[in-house]
């Protein structure tokens, strides 16, 4: 049973951003020398550019198509925000007894001396994401929200304490601010 005759979501395009829609499914967003591509494909959901807007719509959608339209619109808004402003995650290094040494080598974050361990722990940095370590702060920046968030999560998970009481062993690297929201 269709939800409505047509469901349509419109996204305004800022002046500094150019958007191209290829074959009603691939979205290419460019701004300030940065570019992001994303394939957003689902049956009966159409993405097109009209004047100064990107339109995501479906004729006679079911519940699933109606939900996907909102999801695709959010993805496009995040891509526009990413190429125009970028995303930044702020993390704090916390330790009680063993001071950690954090360094960035290639596409990995190396965490030395975590809880006094002899072998370093490693976290993967996703493509197109930059990690900067300064004192007790770790800043993760990038234009792709998903890759930036995944890199921050990789760093946080690399310092997860296993087999010990987490109320006592609070050492680790924790996300304190993500995409402008203080946690």
UniProtKB/Swiss-Prot annotation:
Leader peptide range in chain numbering: none
Keyword Ribosomal protein: yes
Domain of life: Archaea
Pfam families tied to this protein: Ribosomal_L6 (PF00347)
Disulphide linkage map: none
UniProt GO molecular function: rRNA binding; structural constituent of ribosome
GO annotation terms (biological process): cytoplasmic translation
A GO term from the CC aspect: cytosolic large ribosomal subunit
Entries under InterPro entries matching the protein: Ribosomal_uL6-like, Ribosomal_uL6-like_a/b-dom_sf, Ribosomal_uL6_a/b-dom, Ribosomal_uL6_arc, Ribosomal_uL6_CS2
Role description: This protein binds to the 23S rRNA, and is important in its secondary structure. It is located near the subunit interface in the base of the L7/L12 stalk, and near the tRNA binding site of the peptidyltransferase center.
Subunit structure: Part of the 50S ribosomal subunit.
Family assignment from sequence similarity: Belongs to the universal ribosomal protein uL6 family.
Protein name: Large ribosomal subunit protein uL6
High-level lineage: Archaea, Methanobacteriati, Methanobacteriota, Methanomada group, Methanococci
């Amino acid at each position: 049973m269709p939800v409505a005759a047509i469901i349509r979501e419109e996204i305004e395009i800022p002046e500094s951003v150019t958007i191209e829609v290829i074959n009603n499914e691939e979205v290419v967003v460019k701004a300030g020398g940065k570019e992001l591509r994303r394939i957003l494909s689902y049956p009966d959901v159409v993405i097109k550019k009209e004047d100064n807007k990107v339109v995501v719509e479906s004729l006679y959608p079911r519940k699933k198509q109606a939900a996907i339209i909102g999801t695709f619109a959010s993805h496009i808004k995040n891509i526009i925000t990413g190429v125009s402003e970028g995303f930044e995650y702020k993390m704090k290094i916390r330790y009680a007894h063993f001071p950690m040494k954090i360094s960035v080598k290639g596409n990995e974050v190396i965490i030395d001396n975590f809880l006094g361990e002899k072998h370093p722990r490693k976290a993967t940095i996703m493509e197109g994401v930059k990690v900067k370590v300064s004192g007790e702060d770790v800043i993760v920046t990038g234009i792709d929200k998903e890759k930036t968030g995944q890199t921050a999560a990789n760093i946080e998970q690399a310092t997860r304490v296993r087999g010990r009481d987490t109320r006592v062993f609070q050492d680790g690297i924790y996300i304190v601010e993500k995409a402008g929201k203080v946690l």
